[in-house]
UniProtKB/Swiss-Prot annotation:
This is ATP synthase subunit beta 1. Transmembrane segments: none annotated. It is found in: Cell inner membrane. ATP binds at residues 152-159. It is a peripheral membrane protein. Its main location: membrane. One of its GO terms (molecular function) is ATP hydrolysis activity. GO terms for cellular component: plasma membrane; proton-transporting ATP synthase complex.
Amino acid sequence: MPADPEVHFEGTIVAIRGGVVDVAFAEAVPRIHALIVAGGVAMEVASIVGEGVVRCIALGPTRGLGLGTRATGTRAGIEVPVGEGVLGRMLDMFGAPLDGAPPPEATARRPIHRPPPVLSDRVLRAEVLETGIKAIDLLSPIERGGKTGLFGGAGVGKTVLLSELIHNTVEHHHGVSLFCGIGERSREAEELWREMGEAGVRERMVMLFGQMNEAPGVRFLVGHSALTMAEYFRDDREQDVLLLIDNIFRFVQAGSEVSGLLGRMPSRVGYQPTLATELAALQERIASTRRGAITSIQAVYVPADDFTDPAAAHIFSHLSASVVLSRKRASEGLYPAVDPLASTSVMLTPEVVGQRHYDIARGVRRTLAEYEDLRDIIAMLGIEELSAHDRAVVARARRLERFLTQPFFTVGAAAGTLGKLVPIAETLDGCEEILSQTSFERPESAYYMIGALSDLRKEAAA
C-alpha cells in the first residue's frame, strides 16, 4: 500500500548515540524508512525498538540535537528528483545540488527504496561492452547490462582504471551515464566533475556523491538514490544506463557502522549480520529489463589484499565479470595492473566472443601460467638452465605482459604520454602474433606501454 505523505507524526528525541537517534511518538509511529526531521537534521527510521519509540539513522551531523528536541515526519520516505533535469548535475543523496547551481528542475520525485525488477521482466543480453583497454577486453570482457567489479587493495590503480573506463565508454555510450561516489575523497569528486566537463560528456551524465566526510547513513543510502535515478531512465525513458560506482566496499563499510550504532551483534570479521541482505537489496536492482539495461562498473576495495574477506566474497557473487588488480604487477610497473590469471568473465565463451577470441585468451592465460610456474626455477638457477621450449615460453610471456600494458588518457598529463584506445580486433591480432612466435627481433621493452603492435612497426619505419 503506498505511503500517505499527508499523515503527520510528532514526537521528541529520547536518546542520541552518535549517528543513531531514538524518537518517541505519543500516538501512531512512522513506518520503516519514513523520513523524520528534528532540529534541521534529516533521519530515516531504521527500526521500532519499543512501544511508540523508533530508532533512526541520522543523515547529517547530530550536533545541536538534544533530549526533548521536537521531531516531525510523515509516512513518506526519502525521495530524489528524477527526469531530464538532473542531467549534467552534481548532486547529493537527496538530489540537492553540489555544483553551486540552483536545484534541478525535475518532473517528479521518487522514493529511494524500491523493489528490484520481477523475474518475468528481466532479460539476459549476451553483448560485450568494448572498453578499448586491452587487458579487460581480452581476458575479462564486460557484459552490457551486467555488473563488473574492479577488485584491488589500496594504491593498485582502481580509481585510475575506473576513470579511464569512464573516459573510454561514456563518450561512446548512447544512453545516460551515472556516477555514484560512495565514501571516497572529495578531491576525486571535484577532479572527475572537471574532467567530464572538459571531455564534453557532462550533459549526458548525473553525478551523485556521499563522500567519506558524510554521515554513515548518507554513505549507506546514496547508492539507492543513484539507482532510483538510473531506474527512471531505464524504465520510463527506455534508455540504457551506464552506472559507475566508486567504491562499493564503502557501502558495506557504512552499513557496518550503522549496524553497530543500531546495536546489532557483529558477525564474522566485525561485519554486520545483514551484510548479504543489504548488498543484495542494492545489487539486485541493477538489472536488464525489456525496456532497457543498467550496466554497472564498480570499484571494490579489498582490505589488506585479502580476497577471502567477507565483503569481497559477497560482492564477487553478484558480478558477471571480475577484474582483479595485482599489487605484484603494480610494483613491476605493469599498468593497468590487471591479474590475467585471476580476472574472470561469464562473457568469455565461444558463443559470445567467438572461437578465435576465446582461443587467444586461453593461449595468453596458458602462457602466463607456465611462466609463473617457471619463475622459481629462473630465480634459483637462471634462465640459461631452461630448455629451449621453456625459454620460448618465457620470451612470449614477458612480451605479452608488456603488450597488455597501456598508456591512459586520464593520467596522460602526469605521465607525459598520450593515451591509447585499442579496438579488440587489434588486441587479438597483437596477442595472436606474439603467441605464434618462437624468436623475437625486438626486445621485450619495446612492447611496453604501446597500443597495437602496428605502433611498433610505425616507430620502426620512422
